[in-house]
From Swiss-Prot:
Biological function: IF-3 binds to the 30S ribosomal subunit and shifts the equilibrium between 70S ribosomes and their 50S and 30S subunits in favor of the free subunits, thus enhancing the availability of 30S subunits on which protein synthesis initiation begins.
Primary location recorded for the protein, binned into one broad class: cytoplasm
Entries under Gene3D superfamilies matching the protein: Translation initiation factor 3 (IF-3), C-terminal domain, Translation initiation factor 3 (IF-3), N-terminal domain
Keyword field: Cytoplasm, Initiation factor, Protein biosynthesis
Entry protein name: Translation initiation factor IF-3
Quaternary data: Monomer.
Organism of this sequence: Staphylococcus aureus (strain MRSA252)
Length: 175
């Protein structure tokens, strides 16, 4: 039989309560039993006695195979982690005076990020006196967003941040 686990689950001899509300391995409620009786019942069917609700009065214990129970829990946790999607933010840097071919190359890269499910931050850095012509940078960003509107939505409109202007694009939700 098992002893106490790292997660401090009370099993078998490590149970501190004198009386337990007992549930059988089939899920049937047996009723309130003493710890000794419950342990004997678990040993008869060669299973463990595990406290599943320690804060209840009296604590709820279940007769089960603890190793199998832990394995099932770990399997569920792995499935939950698989279902979680980590969204990264990728950055594309442009200049206000970008040429058409360079723009198309950066657009292709941004579209690749968006189709993979990542968010895309498109930024323009103004150097020197170029900051006096913010409207040029804004037009470039709006053109970029317009080219991606079939696969992305604008999460944040063009915004200045120091000497940079940026726009945030998020992939559209797949149906």
């Amino acid at each position: 039989m098992s002893t106490i686990a790292k997660d401090q689950t009370q099993i078998n001899d490590k149970i501190r309560a004198k009386e337990l509300r007992l549930i059988s391995q089939d899920g049937e409620q047996i009723g309130v039993k003493s710890k000794r009786e419950a342990l004997e019942m678990a040993e008869r069917v060669d299973l463990d006695l595990v406290v599943v609700a320690p804060n209840a009065k009296p604590p709820v214990a279940r007769i089960m195979d603890y190793g199998k129970f832990k394995f099932e829990q770990q399997k569920k946790e792995k499935e939950m982690k698989k279902k979680q999607k980590i969204i990264n933010v990728k950055e594309i840097r442009l200049s206000p005076t970008i040429e058409e071919h360079d723009f198309q190359t950066k657009l292709k890269n941004g579209r690749k990020f968006l189709t993979k499910g990542d968010k895309c931050k498109v930024s323009i850095r103004f150097r020197g006196r170029a900051i006096t012509h913010k409207e040029i940078g804004q037009r470039v960003l709006e053109k970029y967003a317009d080219e991606c509107k079939d696969i992305a939505t604008v999460e944040q409109k063009p915004k200045m941040d120091g000497r940079q202007m940026f726009i945030m694009l998020a992939p559209t939700a797949e149906k």
